[in-house]
């Protein structure tokens, strides 16, 4: 089986404002569970942005509770997350992005770290 590189994703979803706060927390935990179990991802960061006003109405709501989750996975099972969003009526909007900019930053930091280790190793052999 071929090795598939782990990628960084950002998933933003909006929960309807008529859902009680306790249920919103449970819904966020369910999304995290799906990312870890079904998508086989590793969560880096969860940002609860809270209630925000919309620029226009979405499904007859003028505001919603925003949550952003940054996670890593190989991307093969992302459809599981999309399916969950689609069948959950409390989630009124969602979008999942691959974060090329964060991947690039991470690769650059790793290459700089390797270069520093190599130059450190070379400096130690000369003494």
UniProtKB/Swiss-Prot annotation:
Region listing for Disordered, in residue ranges: 106-127
This protein's name: Small ribosomal subunit protein bS6
NCBIfam families: S6
Family, similarity comment: Belongs to the bacterial ribosomal protein bS6 family.
Cellular component terms (Gene Ontology): cytoplasm; ribonucleoprotein complex; ribosome
Keywords attached to this entry: Ribonucleoprotein, Ribosomal protein, RNA-binding, rRNA-binding
UniProt biased composition (Basic and acidic residues): 106-117
Any one GO molecular function term: structural constituent of ribosome
UniProt biased composition (Acidic residues): 118-127
Matching HAMAP family: Ribosomal_bS6
Key word Transmembrane present: no
Any one of the GO BP annotations: translation
Function: Binds together with bS18 to 16S ribosomal RNA.
């Amino acid at each position: 089986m071929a090795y598939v590189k782990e990628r960084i994703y950002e998933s933003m979803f909006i929960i309807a404002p008529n859902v009680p706060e306790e249920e919103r927390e449970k819904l966020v935990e369910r999304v995290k569970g799906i990312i870890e179990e079904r998508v086989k991802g590793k969560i880096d960061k969860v940002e609860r942005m809270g209630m925000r006003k919309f620029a226009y109405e979405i499904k007859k709501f003028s505001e919603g509770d925003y949550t952003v989750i940054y996670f890593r996975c190989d991307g093969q099972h992302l459809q599981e997350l999309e399916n969950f969003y689609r069948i959950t009526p409390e989630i009124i909007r969602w979008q999942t992005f691959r974060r090329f900019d964060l991947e690039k930053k991470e690769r650059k930091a790793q290459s700089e770290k390797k270069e520093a280790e190599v130059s450190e190793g070379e400096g130690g052999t000369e003494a």
